[in-house]
Regions:
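Helix-loop boundary and gating motifs at the non-cytosolic
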Residues: 2-52, 211-250
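Cytoplasmic helix-loop-helix junction between adjacent transmembrane helices
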Residues: 101-138
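Symmetry-related core transmembrane helices of the 12-TM Major Facilitator Superfamily/SLC fold
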Residues: 160-176
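Conserved small/polar residues in nucleotide/adenosyl-binding loops
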Residues: 346-352
Length: 355
C-alpha cells in the first residue's frame, strides 16, 4: 500500500460505514410498528447502556490485541444489528438491535481512529487533515442518502435498512483488506500495563490537559442535547404540521449544514460567526418548542451548524493530543465513556427535550 491508496481506503471505509440512509426514517419505522415515544426512549437507553458497559473494556482490548480486529468486529456487529431490525420487527427485536448496536459503537469508538492513525503514520499521511476531508465528503455523500431515504421508505419500510447493510458490508470488506498494524506497535502493546495501571495513566493525561477538559465540558454537554433532540425531530415536525413526505429532504439538508460547520471550523476569518454560534445556540431550543415552521427550521440550522463545528473541533484536538499509540484506543474510549455519562445525564435531567 502507498500513501495515495492509504488515503483512499481510509476515506472509503469511513464513508461507507454511514447510517444516514435509515436515520431519517428510524423514528417513522418504529412508529410504523406501533412503538410509542416512551418505547423509543427505552430503546435509546438500551443503546446507551450497552455502550456504557463495553466502552472501557473494548478500548483496553483494542490496545492489547489490535485495533483492526476490534474495528472488524464492530462493523460485523453493526450489520447484525441492522439485520435484527429487518428480521425481528417487534419490540424485543428492536431491543436486541439496539443492544448489539451499542456494543458495536463501543468497539468502534476507540479502535477506528487509533487504527487509521497508525496506518497514516506508517505511510506518512497527516490523519488530522485527512479526517477533516473525510468529514466533508461524508456529509455530501450522506446528503444524497438522506434525500432518498424517505423515498425508499415509502416503497418499503425495510429498504433503508437493507441499503445500509450493503454499505456496511462494503466498508467491512475494505477494512479486512487493509494492512495490519505495524509490528513494533503490536509488540509494544504486548508489554503494556494492566487495566488498572492503564486507567491511572490515561485518566492522568485527561485530567492534566486543561484545554481538553474545557472542550469536553462544553462540546460533550451541548452536543448531548443536540443528539437527543435529533431523536425527537420527527415528533417536532409532526406537531409543527410538517408532512412526512418532506421530512427526508429536511434531514438531508443537515449534511449541507454540517459541511458548512466544518468550513467555518477550517476558516480563521469566520471568528464573528464562531462567537455568534456560541451565543445563539441556547435559544434554538426555545425556537423548537414554538412549533412554528420558520423558527423550527432556524433552530435546526443553528443546532446542526454548532453540532458539526464543535464535534470537529473536539475530534481533531483529541487526535492531536494522542502521544502514545500503545494506549490510544483506551484514551479515546475513556473520553467516549465521559461522553456517554454526559448524554445519559442530559437524558435523565432534562425531560423537556422529550418534546
Amino acid at each position: 500500500m502507498n500513501k495515495k491508496k492509504c488515503r483512499a481506503e481510509i476515506c472509503l471505509a469511513t464513508i461507507f460505514s454511514t447510517q444516514a440512509l435509515f436515520t431519517p426514517v428510524k423514528t417513522l419505522f418504529l412508529l410504523h410498528f406501533m412503538m410509542q415515544t416512551q418505547d423509543i426512549s427505552f430503546l435509546k437507553f438500551v443503546f446507551t447502556f450497552a455502550s456504557f458497559v463495553f466502552e472501557l473494556p473494548s478500548g483496553y482490548f483494542s490496545d492489547k490485541v489490535g485495533n483492526k480486529i476490534c474495528l472488524v468486529c464492530s462493523r460485523f456487529l453493526m450489520i447484525m444489528s441492522l439485520l435484527a431490525y429487518c428480521m425481528f420487527p417487534y419490540f424485543w427485536g428492536f431491543v436486541a438491535a439496539n443492544l448489539i448496536l451499542g456494543i458495536a459503537n463501543a468497539w468502534e469508538s476507540g479502535a477506528v481512529d487509533s487504527y487509521f492513525l497508525i496506518l497514516c503514520k506508517q505511510f506518512e499521511v497527516e490523519y488530522s487533515s485527512l479526517k477533516i476531508t473525510i468529514k466533508k465528503i461524508s456529509y455530501l455523500f450522506n446528503f444524497t442518502l438522506m434525500a432518498i431515504s424517505t423515498l425508499l421508505y415509502s416503497i418499503n419500510p425495510f429498504l433503508p435498512f437493507w441499503g445500509t447493510i450493503i454499505l456496511m458490508t462494503i466498508s467491512l470488506t475494505i477494512i479486512i483488506g487493509m494492512p495490519k498494524e505495524m509490528e513494533s506497535t503490536r509488540a509494544n502493546k504486548a508489554l503494556s500495563s494492566n487495566f488498572t495501571q492503564n486507567s491511572k495513566v490515561v485518566l492522568g493525561k485527561i485530567v492534566h490537559n486543561k484545554c481538553l477538559l474545557w472542550k469536553m465540558l462544553y462540546t460533550i454537554t451541548c452536543t448531548a442535547i443536540y443528539i437527543l433532540n435529533f431523536e425527537y425531530y420527527t415528533v417536532v415536525f409532526q406537531k409543527a404540521g410538517i408532512g412526512e413526505k418532506i421530512i427526508g429532504p429536511i434531514y438531508s439538508t443537515f449534511m449541507i449544514i454540517n459541511a458548512l460547520g466544518i468550513l467555518v471550523y477550517q476558516k480563521n476569518n469566520f471568528l464573528v460567526l464562531k462567537k455568534l454560534l456560541l451565543i445563539v445556540a441556547p435559544f434554538s431550543f426555545v425556537m423548537l418548542i414554538s412549533y412554528k415552521v420558520p423558527l423550527v427550521l432556524l433552530a435546526i440550522f443553528i443546532q446542526q451548524m454548532s453540532f458539526s463545528y464543535y464535534n470537529c473541533d473536539l475530534d481533531i484536538f483529541i487526535i492531536n493530543s494522542i502521544d502514545d499509540l500503545t494506549t490510544s484506543s483506551y484514551y479515546q474510549s475513556m473520553i467516549s465513556f465521559v461522553n456517554i455519562i454526559s448524554v445519559s445525564y442530559t437524558h435523565l435531567t432534562l425531560p423537556t427535550i422529550r418534546l
